[in-house]
């Protein structure tokens, strides 16, 4: 199954942390193309005032792991990178891994929704995702990733930080 994963970090040595996470994702990858966007340095969204800038990217890989197995693997990697178990939403973090989609699968569980319900409202996910899969249309989407990116880019005051 093809799985899309968002990566983010805004604490510590962000590039090194994401590089390490990408290495672990390559271990999960089984065959075919391993797609990796560039890393975008972005302003934090909905985080406490004064939160550091994020580095964000998106990976797509092939795996035989189930979505829940991927979720548990991601949680293990986040904890190993220094994320507390009781970490609140939208707080600064060393590593954040979000499962965005798995092929054309839909899932609605308390711990996991697929496709991720907030992709189309997050430019920091759509921009790197459009680099690797611009024409992707996920279940429930009326437009492609590139089209959603164009729409949201015009509505949000969002810039890639320099």
Which residues does each predicted region cover?
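Generic detector of short, locally flexible boundary/turn motifs and exposed helical patches
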Residues: 1-3, 21-27, 35, 62-68, ...
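N-terminal beta1-alpha1 ligand-phosphate binding loop
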Residues: 1-31, 36-43
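Short, structured patches in soluble enzyme cores that scaffold and shape functional sites
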Residues: 7-9, 63, 130
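Flexible, gly/pro- and Lys/Arg-enriched active-site loops
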Residues: 39, 45-54, 65-162
């Amino acid at each position: 199954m093809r799985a899309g994963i968002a990566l983010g970090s805004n604490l510590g040595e962000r590039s090194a942390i994401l590089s390490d996470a990408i290495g672990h994702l390559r271990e999960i990858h089984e065959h075919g193309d391993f797609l990796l966007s560039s890393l975008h340095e972005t302003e934090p969204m909905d985080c406490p005032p004064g939160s550091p800038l994020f580095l964000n990217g998106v990976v797509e890989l092939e795996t035989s792991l189930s979505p829940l197995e991927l979720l548990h693997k991601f949680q293990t990697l986040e904890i190993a990178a220094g994320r507390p178990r009781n970490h609140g939403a939208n707080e600064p973090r060393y590593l954040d891994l979000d499962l965005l989609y798995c092929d054309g699968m839909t899932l609605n569980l308390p711990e996991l929704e697929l496709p991720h319900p907030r992709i189309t409202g997050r430019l920091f996910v759509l921009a790197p995702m459009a680099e690797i899969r611009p024409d992707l249309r996920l279940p429930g989407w009326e437009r492609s990733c590139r089209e959603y990116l164009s729409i949201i880019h015009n509505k949000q005051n969002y810039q890639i930080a320099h």
